[in-house]
Each structure stands twice: as structure tokens, then as C-alpha cells.
Amino acid sequence: MSEPPQPPGKPSANAPKPAPRLKSIKPTTPGDANKITTPTIPSIKTKKEFKPNIPTARKKKDEKDPLSGAISDLISASLSPLAVVGDRPGKPNATSSGKFRSNLNPNRKKPAAIPITNLFQTPLVQAETQQPQSTYEMNKKNEKKDSDLLAQLFHEMEVDPMQPFHPTHLPLVDPRKIMKAYSLDDASKDLNETKRELEEKIKNGELSDTTNFTLNSIGSEDNNNNGGGSGQVKFVESSKKKNKEISTKDKPFYVEDQFLNKDKLFFIQLPNLLPSTQSKPNFNIPNPVLPPPKPTTITKTVTNPDGSITTTTIPINENTKIEDQPPPPPKELDEKAFVPVIYPGDFPPSIKEMPSGKLGTLKIYKSGKSILKIGTVEYDISSGDKLKFLEEVQCFQTKGGPDNSPTCYTLGIPSQHLVAAPIISQISGI
């Protein structure tokens, strides 16, 4: 039998039960985004979770700790490990409210961590801006200023620094203020006196005239700030050498400050071409020696068998034989004969073609500077390279030994090599 029709709103008793629909998974609060709730189904048993309970007695004991207070909180905070730069903050506790900050962008970029190497570097702070950490440093700076002022007073008052506790009279005026009264007239007098001293040194050979000097005005900052325009004028050497003493290279005849003036040989190197000037005078020029005139006739003497002698005169022509011509008379110099004088500009400027004899004059100054004068040209002599092997000075004579045999004489070992360079600035007329 068929079942009676049921009303449309009520299901039949034998109809299967529909499956329960799953609820949508949504977090209850924004803070529980990581917590997912599972749907509850009546036929499935839920798993129980174990949650330990804290005993109430222990809880009460912690609350009634006698060491609790502000001091214990400071001690615990000091014993807690410090966070290292670059560590990420921990996750928020479950008890925190799960509210997001409204002004925080969740897609923002994370700040870059500071490298650990930069943590141990010194801060970029000038030393002048750092304040002294204690009164000890301040007293130390004040003592340094006082010592500098005393050193300046010792220098100006000619006080012996080895006896700083010796009684003395200090000036009533600061010596730094005396410089303001230094007038231009005093500066010009000092300038002329310094110039005269330099000229005397150059004349004596103690100082070279090729050294450049410049005038510099030396004035303190206090004078410029207070309107003082006058400053002390001094000669300042513009060369890089701060030591004004003559170097060992400019003392060619000295070895370890000992003058080699006895039984010493020196090797002086001269240039291949020597500069010379036309110093031949234009007056009292001697006439050159003229050769004797050629004979026009030839005289012959013939001895006859009788013993008589006959002389014949034959004129010299182109057809005359050479045998018939007389030999030239020998050239003999008498005491009154003219000897030509050699002037510095007459010979070629080379060492090989120079006339033998006296070469020049050597001048050695007290300062050690040496100048060789050849003719009218002066040469500056300086020490050359040191001897690196054995050198001997020898003299050869072609006919000095027995039976007119050649002989060699050893004179000695040269003490030093010297180099002669012409002083071009003093040559005039080249």
C-alpha cells in the first residue's frame, strides 16, 4: 500500500536525515587569526586537552614574598640578559588584547639591523667638543698653559731652564703685548743689519749667493684682532733645507771635519769643454815673427887642384835643382827673441789642447767651501762618489831608468774624488 501523501512542510518518518552543514570558519576576534575553531559534530567526540592547574598555596606564597618590592625589581632587571641589537621581538602573549594599531601598516618594510662591527667603533665626535670628565683633567690643562707661559718667559728673559726655582724678577707687563710697540723704523733697521750680515757671509764664502731669501711679516693673531698691523720682519730662507750649516758635500777637502792638507792626493774631474772668455787686450799687440826672406842667388865654392878656391854665384830659377839650393838656416831663440803670450781666449776650450803648466788657482775658505779659478772662470768644487776599489796615481818616464829605460813611479792613493762645475752665473761675455 502506498503511503498517504504528506504535507509539503513536514518530512516523512522513513526519509533519511540530511547531513549537518559545516559552519564557516571565521576568527572571533582579529587577535585570534592564528586560532582556528573546528565545527562541532554531535557524532564525533572532541579531544580533551590537559591544562595543569597551579596550586593555590604556591600562588599565595609568591604573592607574599618578603623580598618583593622596588629593590628586588631593580635587582631582577639588572640580572636579566640584555637584548642584542638586531634580535626580533618575541611573540605577544595570549592574554594580550588582539587589537591592531590603527596607524601601523602591516605591509611596511622591516628596519635594517645595525651591523655588530659598527657597535665597537669610536664615535665620530671631535676631541675639542668633549668636556673633561673630572677636575684632574682641567687642572692638567691649566698646568700646561702655565708651563708654556713660563717657557716663553725663560726664553725672553734668558733664565736658565735647568734652575727653574732660582729667584728672578718677572715683568709687570705681558711680554706678548710689547710686540705691538714694535714700529716700522725698528723693523727697517733690523732688516738692514740682517742684510749686511748676509752680504759679509757671502763675501767670506760661508753662504752661497744663489740661496733665495724672502721677506715675511710675522705677527701674532692678537695683533690682528686688536688692530695691530705692524709685525716683526725677518729673513726667512725659502729653501727646503732647515739646517743652515754647510753639508759635507760642500766640504770636499774635509773628512769627518778633519782638513786634509798634508801629503794627500785628490782626483779632480773637469768638464770636457771649459768655458772661456775673450780677455785678450786690444792694445800693445806684439807683431808676429815673420819667416826670413827666400834667397835669390846661390854661391858655390870650388877647390882647384892647385889649391886655389873659386866662388861662383848662380841665380835661383825654376830650373835650379834642389840639390843646388842651400838648406834653411836653423831657428835659434836668443834672450831678446819674442815668445808669444797665450791668453784664455786663444786656445780651444778642451783639456787635451790646453797648454801645459799651471792650470789655475785653488781657493779654500774657512767654512770649507772651495773654488778653482781657471783664467777668469770660477769652478765650484764638491765631493764626488766614494772610492769603491783601489786606485793609485802613477807617473811614467820614458827615459828615467838605467840605460835610458822607461820607469814607473807610484805617487800614492787619492784620498777623495772631487767634481769641478763652472759657476755660470758669474761668467760674463760668453
UniProtKB/Swiss-Prot annotation:
Localization (cell): Nucleus
InterPro entries reported in the protein's UniProt record: RPC4
Feature: compositional bias, Low complexity: 35-44, 296-313
GO molecular function: DNA binding; DNA-directed RNA polymerase activity
GO annotation, biological process: transcription by RNA polymerase III; tRNA transcription by RNA polymerase III
Protein family: Belongs to the eukaryotic RPC4/POLR3D RNA polymerase subunit family.
Protein name per Swiss-Prot or TrEMBL: DNA-directed RNA polymerase III subunit rpc4
